[in-house]
Each structure stands twice: as C-alpha cells, then as structure tokens.
Amino acid sequence: MKRRQFLATGTAGLANLSLPAFLCAAPAATDLSQPAPVNPFLDWFGIDEALIRRVMSELTARGADFAELYFQHKRANVIRMQDGIASQASSDIMQGVGLRVVVGDQTGFAFTEDLNPESMLRAARTAATIASGQGATVPAHFDPKRQGDLYSVERPWSEVGLDEKLPLIRKVEAMARAADPAIDKVTVRLTDTDERVLIATLGGHLLTDRRPSVLMGLQLTAKRGGQTQSNLGSLGARSDIGFYTDRRLKDLVDEAVSRTLVLFDARRPPAGEMPVMLAAGASSVLLHEAIGHGMEADFNRIGTSIYSDMIGKPVAESFVTVVDQGDLPHELGTLNMDDEGNATGRAVLVDKGILKSYLHDNLSARHYGLDRDGATHVGSGRRESYRFPILPRMTSTFMENGPHTRDEIVAAIDRGIIAETFTGGQVAIGAGDFTFYVKNGWLVEGGKITAPIKDVNLIGNGPEALKRITMVANDFKLDPGGWVCGKGGQNVPVSIGMPSALVSRMTVGGENV
C-alpha cells in the first residue's frame, strides 16, 4: 500500500480542499441565474423514469447483482480576499452521471458528462461489458424515496449573492485586524456549494438529496520583534449563510489569532520517545488517518488491513470507544444517504476496547453477509463525484468520552507534550505507520504545562498508538473546521472529533538536547 499525503485543514490547505474539476456547463437553454428546480435532472435535462429504465436495462443487459445510476449536479462558488482586496471570485458547475453494475466480484463502471440518451446508453454498454450472462430484471417502476433531512437550509447557496458574502468576509478580516496590532496580513476564503444527487437503483428506488456545504478559511500572518509567524483556522458546515453568527465568527478569529501569536514564544521540544496527550478536537486527525482507514471494509476484505481478522478482539483499553456517525446534523461529514442510496447512521467500530465492525459499502456488506434476513448495514459508500466509483469511507469519526479529566491526564505526564493542532502528515493505510506534523502544542514537565511548542513531528503506528491510550478525558469536542480526506484518488469532506487522550509513548521529532 502506497504512503499517501493527508489533506489538511485550513486556509493553507485550501488548494487541497478543492472541489472536483468542473468540466461541463449546463445546456445553453438553461438559465442558471434562476434557483434550481426541485428535480433539476428532470426539468433541465428531461431525465424521466422511462429514460432511467431504458438506461438501466442497457446497463444490466448482460447480468447484474446490483446496479445504480448516480446523477450529480453541483454549483461551487469561491471568494478569496487578501488584505482587503478580492483576489478571486469564481462560480463553477459540474454535472454528469456515473453508471455501475456489479456481477459477482466484478464491477463495471463508466460515466458521462453529457446527460443525453445517446451518451448515457453508450456509457451503460461500456460498463456492462464485464458480464456475459442473462440480463437482469429491471423494475417496472422506481419508487421515489428520501432518507433524511439532516441539513435543511432556509436559502441554498445558489441564491446568495456577492452582496451578502463580501460583507461577511470583510467583517472577519476586520475582526482579525482588531484582535492584535501584530496581525499583519489576513486572507479569508469562502467556498460554498449547492449539490443535487439523484440515485436510481436496480432495486427500484429513486432517491434524491440536496447537499449544501460551506467552508470559511482564515490565514493570518503576524509580525513582532523581527519575527514573522503564520497560522490558520477554518469553520465549515452543511448549512446556509445564517450559520456564520457573530459568536461563531468571533470564535474562529479568536482561535486563529491565539494559534498565531503563541508561536512567537513557542520552541521545538526535546526529541525522543515520550507520552503524548492528544488534545480534544482536531487531534482526531490521527485517529481518522492512522486508525480509521484500517477499519474500512475494502482493506479488510482483501486482507491488507491489520484489522482484517480482529473482529471481536481487543484493540484498545476498555474505556476506548470509536464511532463513525454519518447522521450528525449539519456536520460536513454528514449525509442523508450515502452515494449508494443507503441510510447513514451510527457505526460503532470499537466498543469499550473491542473491535466490533467495519465501514461498509454494498459490495463489502454482501461479502460479509450483513444484508440478510431484513438487516441492513450503515451506509458508508462514498464517491468524490459521478466520475469515481464507490469506496467505503468515513463520515464523522470520533472517540467518545472516557472516565478521566484533562487535568488528570496532564498531571500524569512527567515529561511529554500535548499535541493541539495538526497541519499534515503521511500514513500507510494498511499497516497504519504514520508521520504527523504538529503546528501547535505544549510542553509538559512534572505534571504541569510549562511552555508552548511548535513544528513537531509525531512518528508511530496507528494500531499500536490505539493500544497505548492509557487515559481518555471527558472533554469531547468535534472540530469545527473543514477537513478533506483522500483515498484512492478521491477527496471527500469529513468531520473529526475526540476528547483529550493520553498515548503512553510515541516518538517525538524535536530538538536533540
């Protein structure tokens, strides 16, 4: 398994927090200045049930265990303001359909950006070439269905203009500059999307979802005494412009300013193996990357994950519980349904130290026999866009509260560090070996926090780190920022969180003393 670069959070990583390439505009006859209709695929492109049935028949003409058509239409708007000047303002559209058919262990997949009958039928025939059997029975009728309403908005972002967005961005810049005279440069970027999805399944369901999202990134540069320091913050949700209340904006600015200014007094810690307290919130990036991916079912189905034969076995202390939950209202990782049309929900991966389950798509759920006798798996099949196949993916992944307090954990550290904010790293998904870069943290000596630290490398192994968690606090926090996870060449938004937790030992890359 190749090592891969983790896509970090915040404005400095906004090039990594990019949306898919928008390769196709809507037809000239469509007035995209108007609000999107309830079903744009029908109203804009004439994709009705009869056409869906025709394409599905072609897709499954040589056999199918299951199949789906995944239609997507997505608008994205980006505004970037640097030191009071709008340096970027763009609006893009992507649209298309992905077609998949599964026969046994074989998957046929094709996509087209052209939502006309000829292009879709041609793509269906391409995907169907994997099979050579008798055609599947296509339902005579597709039943409309919705799986939830976890991120309803008063107004979609496609109806919010620059006259409302620019004052919001200018307010954030003014708040940052007023926070401290050392703040020298301020960059604010607002990215919003209005996405429509329509999924037609061989099982006869026709599912729709409207997925809003917004992410504000803030990057600050401060100057003091001949030194220059930079840091960042971000705040995102599946919500509308009303999400950015004065209280939330103040919290975003205060956090970013604090993270930046503390770097003037920070130093690198001593290098070596020592206890590491993972701070509540963003430290869950380590949990997500170094541990969570190993619990995705595709890696376990093919035996490349260290957890492949560990179901029912202890992987952590009894006070450690790890959950992936895709139905937390308005979180960026939340989905009403996954990209196969299955309902999302709460999947307990580690329950009181015991590995209980993996994250599944339809293919792995069938392999593990989960969807039998009326049972259904928690939907975790995701894709970056219609151009990509389905993979089991995390949504909102977190560790639950434990029996300790943060103060008790700090007091238990004789010589170690607190890792507070992360800006990137690498991980080998199967084995879980990792290197993470800590931007902000604290030195702990004799059970007391003694100094801020910066620019720290954490080196270790995810499954081993999970086993070495000896204390978990009761200060759980979901990180409010925007995170994008990369896997198999696909990037999807996720949410992360955890309480403070103590890893008894980890290799810290600092200064040799």
Predicted regions and their residues:
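N-terminal small-residue-enriched
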Residues: 2-513
